[in-house]
C-alpha cells in the first residue's frame, strides 16, 4: 500500500489536479473503507492527515497506519490460543504429549539395555557408557529435552554411541538386531527431521490431528455443495487427460473441497491446477502444479497453503510473527539448503523441520535490468512455508507427529486461523 502511494505522492504530475484538502479527504475516506483497518486506529490517522502540510505528510500518516495494521494482523497469540483449545477438544493435551514422550523414552531405554547386556562381558567400558546414557535419558524431563538429548547422543559425528551399538550387533539375536537397526535408523542425526517416532506413536498422534482438522472442515461456514462446485472449476480436460487410464491417485475434487471448507472459502488466487511429475510448486500466476497420480495428496495441500497466504495478505504477517518466535538464538542465522544457482534460504530454528523456516528474499532490479535477490530476512520475506507446512500435516503422518511432539505450535496456528477465516463472514 505505502509503496504504491509513495510512487504517486512523489510524482508531481500524478496529483497536479488535486488540492491538498482533496487529497486529505480522499485518504480518510479510503482508510474508512478498508476492512483490515481496525476502527481504533482511525482517529490517530485522521488527526495526522488533517495536520499534514503536504503530500509527504499524508504519506507519513499512511506509513504509521500501515505499521499499526501490520502489528495488529501479525499478532498470533489469540489465534494460537484458539487452536490450542481446539486440539484439547480432540485429545491433544500436554498429558497426551507426555504419554508419547514416556513411551518413546521407555522404548529407547529398552533397546539400549540390550546393548549394555550384550557388551557387559565383551566390552565393560562401552557397557558402562551405555548405562550412563540410559540414566541421562531416564532423567530427561519434557519432550524438548528428550528430543535434544537423543539428537545429540545418536549423532554419528563426534559421538561414540552409534559405534558402540554397531559393536553390540555381533552379540545379539536376530530379533534384537532388528530392534537395534531400527534404533539407529530413527535416531541417527538427520538435519532435516532431527528425530523420528515409531509407527504406533505416529498413528496415535495423527489420528487426533485428523479428528481436529476434519471437525473444522465439517463445521465450516462453507457448505459441502458450494465447496464441490468450486472444486469442479479446476477439473479441466487437461486434468482429466492426465488421469485417464490411471488407477488410484488424488481425488482432486474432494481434496480441493476439503481445503476450501477448512479455510472458509478464503482462497481467491488459485486459477488452475495442472498435472506435473516434477517437483510440485505454486506461483502468483494462480497455478498449482502437482503429480495428480500420486497416492498421497500432501503435496496438493502444501501448495494450496501458498495460495491461502497469497489470498490473505494478513496471513503473511502472522507467518512472519510465527517465524520470529521460533528463531534459535538471539537473531536469525541463515543457511542455504539449495545451490549457488538457485538458493533456498532457511534460518536455524526450534521447529521440527528446517523447511518450515524457509524465507523468500525480496528481489530488486539493477540499473541494467538484472533481477537480484536481496539478503534473506524474516521481516521482509515475500512468502513463507508456514501455512503450506501446516496444511501438509493433514496427509503427512510423520510431519504431523514430529511437529506436535516438538511443540512447534504450527497446527494450533492453522486451526485458530481457520476458525477466524470461517467467522469472517
Give each language-model segment a name.
Residues 2-38, 42-48, 59-64, 74, ...:
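Active-site-flanking segments in enzyme catalytic domains
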Residues 54, 119-120, 142, 146-149:
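Noncatalytic nucleic-acid binding interfaces
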Amino acid at each position: 500500500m505505502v509503496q504504491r502511494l509513495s510512487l504517486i505522492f512523489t510524482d508531481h504530475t500524478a496529483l497536479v489536479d488535486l488540492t491538498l484538502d482533496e487529497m486529505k479527504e480522499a485518504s480518510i475516506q479510503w482508510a474508512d473503507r478498508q476492512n483490515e483497518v481496525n476502527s481504533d486506529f482511525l482517529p490517530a490517522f485522521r488527526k495526522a492527515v488533517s495536520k499534514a502540510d503536504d503530500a509527504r505528510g499524508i504519506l507519513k500518516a499512511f506509513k504509521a497506519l500501515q505499521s499499526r495494521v501490520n502489528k495488529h494482523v501479525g499478532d498470533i497469540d489469540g489465534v494460537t490460543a484458539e487452536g490450542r483449545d481446539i486440539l484439547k477438544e480432540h485429545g491433544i493435551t500436554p498429558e497426551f504429549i507426555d504419554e508419547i514422550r514416556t513411551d518413546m523414552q521407555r522404548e529407547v531405554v529398552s533397546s539400549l539395555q540390550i546393548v549394555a547386556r550384550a557388551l557387559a562381558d565383551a566390552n565393560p567400558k562401552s557397557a558402562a557408557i551405555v548405562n550412563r546414557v540410559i540414566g541421562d535419558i531416564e532423567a530427561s524431563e519434557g519432550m524438548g529435552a528428550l528430543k535434544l538429548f537423543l539428537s545429540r547422543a545418536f549423532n554419528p559425528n563426534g559421538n561414540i554411541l552409534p559405534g558402540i551399538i554397531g559393536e553390540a550387533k555381533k552379540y545379539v539375536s536376530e530379533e534384537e538386531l532388528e530392534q537395534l537397526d531400527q534404533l539407529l535408523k530413527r535416531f541417527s542425526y538427520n538435519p532435516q527431521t532431527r528425530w523420528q517416532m515409531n509407527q504406533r506413536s505416529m498413528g496415535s498422534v495423527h489420528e487426533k490431528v485428523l479428528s481436529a482438522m476434519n471437525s473444522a472442515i465439517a463445521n465450516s461456514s462453507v457448505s459441502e455443495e458450494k465447496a464441490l462446485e468450486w472444486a469442479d472449476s479446476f477439473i479441466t480436460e487437461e486434468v482429466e487427460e492426465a488421469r485417464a487410464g490411471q488407477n488410484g491417485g488424488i481425488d482432486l475434487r474432494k481434496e480441493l473441497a476439503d481445503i476450501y471448507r477448512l479455510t472458509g472459502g478464503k482462497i481467491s488466487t488459485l486459477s488452475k491446477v495442472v498435472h506435473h511429475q516434477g517437483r510440485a510448486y505454486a506461483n502468483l500466476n494462480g497455478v498449482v502444479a502437482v503429480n495428480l497420480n500420486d497416492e498421497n495428496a500432501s503435496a496438493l495441500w502444501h501448495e494450496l497453503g501458498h495460495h491461502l497466504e497469497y489470498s490473505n495478505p494478513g496471513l503473511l504477517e502472522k507467518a512472519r510473527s510465527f517465524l520470529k518466535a521460533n528463531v534459535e538464538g538471539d537473531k536469525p542465522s541463515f543457511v542455504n539448503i539449495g545451490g549457488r544457482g538457485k538458493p533456498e534460504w532457511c534460518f536455524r530454528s526450534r521447529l521440527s523441520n528446517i523447511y518450515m523456516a524457509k524465507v523468500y528474499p525480496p528481489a530488486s532490479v539493477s540499473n541494467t535490468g538484472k533481477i537480484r535477490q536481496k539478503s534473506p530476512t524474516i521481516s521482509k520475506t515475500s512468502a513463507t512455508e508456514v501455512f503450506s507446512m501446516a496444511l501438509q500435516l493433514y496427509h503427512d503422518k510423520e510431519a504431523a507427529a514430529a511437529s506436535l511432539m516438538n511443540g512447534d505450535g504450527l497446527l494450533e496456528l492453522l486451526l485458530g486461523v481457520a476458525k477466524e477465516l470461517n467467522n469472517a463472514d
